[in-house]
Structure formats: structure tokens, C-alpha cells
């Protein structure tokens, strides 16, 4: 890694309060595939995509959450624990934790991801958080992961259990509409505009043909999530 990249790693380690024994692990975790591809085209051989770390991080987060929920909520049933774990391991929740530690500021992205607001995209932030969790796990074990991240996961787990926050908007909305109306929501793409690297999609959410909410986002998936979030707010107010 070069000096500029090394400085970013030092800043991030200070941010999360953990100093890596092997900083190369963190460097790998922060390298998006777009950045690795660009750097390899420039002749660099030390830059690898973080995709393998994402795979491991997903499993580490599952273990961290399962252990925490089992110990912290002894009265909770398997079904309740599974539901809470799914909510906290969702893309939306992981992206929020990534924002809590300002992860977007420290990521290494290719030019295309930079211009398309990759640093703010839920999917990219969630994947990057998984990679960083895996890097901490390899470097310092589960104890280090708990030290760095458990407080963030625990905070949101408690809020989900208490019903104070929703992360998986589409699933939550589906549960509401099935229980209340015995119907499933329908998502309809009604508009798509902008250049290929800066698309903006508009989705209408309908229930039994009736317009309930509209969502916009840089992808159809993000627009659907926003529509579901707005629909939940509206239905809770009814």
C-alpha cells in the first residue's frame, strides 16, 4: 500500500479503537472490487478485492448476534431470536452501523463507484462492514470483534426487540398487510431517469390496487425499500 492509503488505515483504526497486528487485513477489507480492478490495471499486484472477507464476515456476524441474543434474552423463543437476528443482519441495519462508524469515509472505491455515490449506498456499506468484521476476526479473534462492534449490534438489537426501530422494511410491511388486510403489497416501477452511472428510480407501492406510498432511489431495490418505509409510517398512523 502507498503512504496515502496507510494514512487512511491509521485514521480508521483510531476511529474504531482497534490497532491491527496485520494492517494488510484491514487494507484488504476496505478495498472494493472496483478499486482492486483499477489498481491492477495500473500494474499494482498488492490490491485484492474484499469479497472473500465479506463471505467470512457474514458468518462472524451471525455468530456474534446468535451468542448475544442467547445470553442477553434468556426468555426469548427461538423464533423471536431468529427474527431479531435477521433484522440486525439485514442490509439496512449493517449499513446503519457502517454509517455509525463513518465507514464510507475510509473505503477505497473505483471511479465509477465514486461518481455514483457508492459511499452512501446501503448494499456497498453493508458488504464493506462484513469485510471489516472479518478482518478484525482474523486479526484478533471473536474477542476483538466484540470489543469493536458488539455495542453497535446490541444497541439496535434492543431497539428491535422493544419495537422502537424497523430495518427490514419490506418484510415488516408484508407482515403488517397480511395481518391487517390479508393482502401482499405490490411494487410498480413507474419512472427511471438519469445517466447509467447516476440512475434514479421511482416505485409506487400499491395495496389491492390502491396507491399507498412512493419511493425513490439509485436502484429499484432502494426505491422499493423507501416506498415500504413510507408505507409503514402511513399505516401506523391510520
Swiss-Prot record:
Its EC number is 3.1.26.3. Residues 9-141 form the RNase III domain. Its cofactor is Mg(2+). Residues 168-237 form the DRBM domain. The keyword Nucleotide-binding does not apply. PROSITE patterns: DS_RBD (PS50137), RNASE_3_1 (PS00517), RNASE_3_2 (PS50142). One of its GO terms (molecular function) is metal ion binding. Belongs to the ribonuclease III family. This is Ribonuclease 3.
